[in-house]
């Protein structure tokens, strides 16, 4: 049975002419859910030259969006970008894609959540953007709840599978060494197959598409693909990384990104893969990526800061001392100003007033009044 994501996957390729794309897009429209047809009804192509055309769609602002990008944002449930492309789409219409993804075991949404979470960790907690042993150790000390949790996992000896098919195992002498080993085993091109409605995924490393591996990668701790899902010819596979230059390409993979520019070495035509499968490039992890992958971001931040403040009272006092001195100086200055006003300015004004006052002449009272006043004063 033809499905939306099956037909959308079929147009994620380079076409020899525009007419063929229009035919495939007509089939796609028959399975397109409400809210998405307004864009997919406006097919267009970008001429790449040499009889090659990139399929895509013209938006209302005349902007071209490629079929690869449409695949990426809908498969990955990238809601902000979905709203940006499909103007006026409603929440229920976006939610309708969930069931369609589950029907085809599309794993991209879960992988997108991990990437988004990892990016947020690295942005909000820059101390986790490290790969060295010293950097990892400092980050753990700054986040004691995370440290405590991972130390407990190490004591239990429970290994964890990461998104890229590598494992965080607890077999080294220290937790920091365990983490460094896991980081060394990440990075490369991965063949991913969704299962359980896309909630889980099996991933393996495609060595021929991984053009730069960590020199300390232990392949025995990484799930390696026993075949390439698209290419069977050995010579063709060996040629993928020919002339690779990381400084220019800024990625460790080639032919591993279905949404890349078709003229770049990173583009891969996955139109022949089932919708529940994909090829993707994962750059080497740092600690922030690892935390996001494992969903441990809730162990960062506030509690770690509280722990630091309670265990480092001297540090807190040192930070507050300049403020205390400033407040004291302001109060002292205010006291000086008050004293000057009270005894100099106000006192001087009183003396001047006394000098200017007219003389007072006191007349002696009658004798009877004097006796009365004297008696009254004694009472």
Swiss-Prot record:
It is found in: Virion membrane. InterPro entries: Baculo_ODV-E56 (IPR006733). Its main location: virion. GO terms for cellular component: membrane; viral envelope; virion membrane. It holds the Pfam family Baculo_E56. It comes from Choristoneura fumiferana nuclear polyhedrosis virus. The chain crosses the membrane at residues 156-176, 320-340. Structural protein that is specific for occlusion-derived virus (ODV) envelopes but not of budded virus (BV). Keywords: Glycoprotein, Late protein, Membrane, Transmembrane, Transmembrane helix, Viral envelope protein, Virion. It is a multi-pass membrane protein. This is Occlusion-derived virus envelope protein E56. Belongs to the baculoviridae E56 family. Expressed late in infection. Glycans are attached at residue 184.
